[in-house]
Amino acid sequence: MRDAFAFGPVCHQPPDRKGTRFPGGTPVYDEDCLYLNVWAPAGAESLPVMVWIHGGTFLTGAGSQPLFDGAALALSGNVVVVSVNYRLGPFGFLHLAPLGDDYSSNVGLLDQIAALEWTRGNIAGFGGDPQRITVFGESAGSMSIAALLAMPAARGLLTGAIMQSGPSQAFRPEQGEAVALGLLAELGIDRANAGKLLELPAEAIMEAAGRLVQRLTGGSPAMIFQPVVDSLTLPEEPVRAVANGSAAGIPLLIGTNAHEGHYFFREGAQVPAIEESLKVLQQALGTPDLSELASHYPANWEGPAGILTDLFFWGGAIAFAESQLEHGPVWMYRFDWGVKEHPLLLRAVHTAEIPYVFGNMSHLRDLGLAISPPMESLSSSMQNAWIAFAHGGRPGTRDLPWPEYGLTERATLIFDETACVVKDPDPEKRRLVFKYIS
């Protein structure tokens, strides 16, 4: 028997100086961090399972963050909710496989697969059905799901996927190797002696990774630690693997928020000049010259915010949805809700949908917001759709019919004060950004 009345340690990551990830206090950070959490209704038996994979740019986060508490979702949906930890940053996403047979890559993704294997083998003891496991995640968690759908080792471990605000993202092998060698250089270790990493304290590796991130990105949204195409673990870029049938038969619910980029580029913050911001986006997105695209956006901080929203998040979600259309049913959503009383949540920014999906409205109260009836209704609508998907592989409900996404009508469920289906929202902008999506 194991005492499981407290959350396990959190994987090493940059400190939470603002207290936004863990507002209740500083968690324990440890390399022994591969724990998961289970919430189940009393008397649960053969209930569908929802496994949450947290985001955080592959650098931060944990399944134990209060925002991801699964109690409300489990009770309202009669489901079993699981949240998982996985190794982050240089500990989870350093592409070391090219250095020899003793080294691995994508171990953060392999941690997620281990959690899914544990869930399949043990969740019946908590009242869950191992034959109905839906993975859902946001940002880097959603990008992780894109990778899982492409990984041979994950096949058979999940029966449905919900991707929130995170498209397919993976380095080419040479990009991942350059980052790995850059970290070794920061630590004064040459390629032939990479095994010395095992002799270093985690804090030293974290500090070197922080210096490398700053040097390579200049503080931009670019992610230097992320999944890498690797012959043993992730043999093909996820969107291409899915287009080739790697996720055949798996229902997919995918979507974005209307103003994702306004989370990263904010009014009043120190934002580079528009030319520098475009360079930052080109680096972060791996796209060619964006100057022509930028001419369609405001020539201030809102321009880069809009491009990041439309090209990376929205365009990426559409591209991934299209890759799965021939192989399984797909549903598309967009979260538009904003709260006038909050300067950041005034718009539907990145992460804004999470408390509504989990039903954790206390998170919004902690931000000083009064919970209005429309907010409660929005949360119920989103929870009911996610729960219906977990139970039966379709998000539509009697109160909220939701047609499948297809190339002809591109039906998209818009979550706002009232939820409604819109056919092909903003088609001109969709065609514009797709010129930049390979």
Feature roles, as predicted:
Residues C33, D102-A124, Q175, G182:
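Alpha/beta-hydrolase active-site loop
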Residues G121, R155, G160, Q164-V280, ...:
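Substrate-access "cap/lid" subdomains that shape
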Residues F126-E138:
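Alpha/beta-hydrolase fold nucleophile elbow
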Residues L232-L234, I250, N300, G315, ...:
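Alpha/beta-hydrolase-fold serine-hydrolase catalytic core, especially in secreted/extracellular enzymes
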Residues M1-N106, P221, L364-M382, A390-L400, ...:
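Non-catalytic accessory segments of hydrolases
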Residues G137-A140, P152, S165:
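Catalytic nucleophile serine of serine hydrolases
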Residues S142-A154:
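Short glycine-enriched nucleophile-adjacent loop
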Residues G55, V107-D111, S139-S142:
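Active-site loop->helix "elbow" adjoining a glycine-rich segment at hydrolase catalytic centers
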